Curated annotation (Swiss-Prot):
Annotated source species: Bacillus subtilis (strain 168)
Family as reported in the entry's similarity comment: Belongs to the zinc-containing alcohol dehydrogenase family.
InterPro entries (UniProt xref): ADH-like_C, ADH-like_N, ADH_Zn_CS, GroES-like_sf, L-Threonine_3-DHase, NAD(P)-bd_dom_sf, PKS_ER, Zn_alcohol_dh
Function: Catalyzes the NAD(+)-dependent oxidation of L-threonine to 2-amino-3-ketobutyrate.
A GO molecular-function annotation: L-threonine 3-dehydrogenase activity
Binding site for Zn(2+) 2: 98, 101, 104, 112
Cofactor: Zn(2+)
Subunit-level organization: Homotetramer.
Identification of the protein by name: L-threonine 3-dehydrogenase
Record CDD domains: TDH
Site (Important for catalytic activity for the proton relay mechanism but does not participate directly in the coordination of zinc atom): residue numbering on this chain: 153
């Protein structure tokens, strides 16, 4: 088992940015595994932490190592771990659940009452090594590219968002084409949606959405999404709306563009409470609204694995940049600019 020091990206104090430094390699307990990180992906949550915005100030306790999307090789296992072996190539579910609350005991551990998140509430993966509970391990095929393997967790968000509905044969609208929105476009197309409408203001990401399978892209700075969706659906609206932006105006538009009897799935995290027209946009339309959090453990991971292994989705276009961990600032500046898809850091 490894001991000594490792390089790691730390949030040292309550301020903008992060610091690359040396810290002790994590010591694992009897139920944990130690993983040597091969690739780590920057998530929108990591950008919130890097920016040190209101959410980060309220949630994050510094100093700590952040990052939660990764792939790597198991280098050590705790004394009570029999399900994971040294040398296995893995990724990890990032929600650490208690296994004792009512949701956990009734097959809904993705909404565990006592959830902790790797890289948010515990030390994360922007480092040479990370430790995780053995129960969170997901084994990867030996031939899977480490960068692809590192983005299975956010792909799981997209899969969960889209496949809680039955998009086949209908129209899916994806509002917000950040990396998870881009992956949701690919999932909807793979699931048989006849139309996948990608909506954003970022022309770079709308071009990526086309590569990911969008049948139509809508720039909100040039076009009216409601008119476009109405025209493409003979006035009926989208059967499924996936809200990924978190903007109040986008949420209102999403509810308005959903078809009567349709579904509105929201993964985004609005910064402030949002007022919606429940009477006209939800009740009278018979709309189903579903909040999406995390991934179902582990049925969503199985869907992710099968979508990748069957080549039903191509994730290559969404990974636009890779940097060594030492050049993390370039990666975070790209993420902050929006002129990228997924950015990968290599320790």
């Amino acid at each position: 088992m490894q001991s000594g020091k490792m390089k790691a990206l730390m949030k040292k104090d309550g301020a903008f940015g992060a610091v690359l430094t040396e810290v002790p390699i994590p010591e694992i307990d009897k139920h944990e595994v130690l993983i040597k990180v091969k690739a780590a992906s920057i998530c929108g949550t990591d950008v919130h932490i890097y920016n040190w915005d209101q959410w980060a100030r309220q949630r994050i306790k510094t100093p700590y190592v952040f990052g939660h999307e990764f792939s790597g090789i198991v280098e050590g296992v705790g004394e009570n771990v029999s399900s994971v072996k040294v040398g296995e190539y893995v990724s990890a579910e990032t929600h650490i659940v208690c296994g004792e609350c009512v949701p956990c005991l009734t097959g809904k551990s993705h909404v565990c009452t006592n959830t902790a998140i790797i890289g948010v509430d515990t030390a994360g993966c922007f480092a040479e090594y990370v430790k995780v509970p053995a129960d969170n391990i997901w084994r990867n095929p030996a031939d899977m590219d480490p960068s692809i393997a590192s983005i299975q967790e956010p792909l799981g968000n997209a899969v969960h968002t889209v496949l809680e509905s039955q998009p086949a044969g209908g129209t899916t609208a994806v509002i917000g084409c950040g990396p998870i929105g881009l992956m949701a476009v690919a999932v909807a197309k793979a699931a048989g949606a006849s139309q996948v409408i990608a909506i954003d203001k970022n022309e770079y990401r709308l071009r990526l959405a086309k590569q990911m399978g969008a049948t139509c892209t809508v720039s909100i700075e040039k076009e009216d999404p409601l008119k476009i969706v109405s025209a493409l659906t003979s006035g009926e609206g989208a059967d499924l709306v996936c809200e990924m932006s978190g903007h109040p105006s986008a949420i209102a538009q999403g509810l308005a563009m959903a078809a009567n009897g349709g579904r509105f799935h929201i993964l985004s995290l609005p910064e402030h409470p949002v007022t919606i027209d429940l009477t006209n946009k939800v009740v009278f339309k018979g709309l189903t609204i579903q909040g999406i959090t995390g991934r179902k453990m582990f049925s969503t991971w199985r869907q992710v694995s099968q979508l990748i292994s069957s080549n039903m989705i191509d994730l290559a276009p969404v990974i636009t940049h890779q940097f060594p961990l030492e050049e993390f600032e370039k990666g975070f500046e790209l993420m902050r600019s929006g002129q990228c898809g997924k950015v990968i850091l290599i320790p």
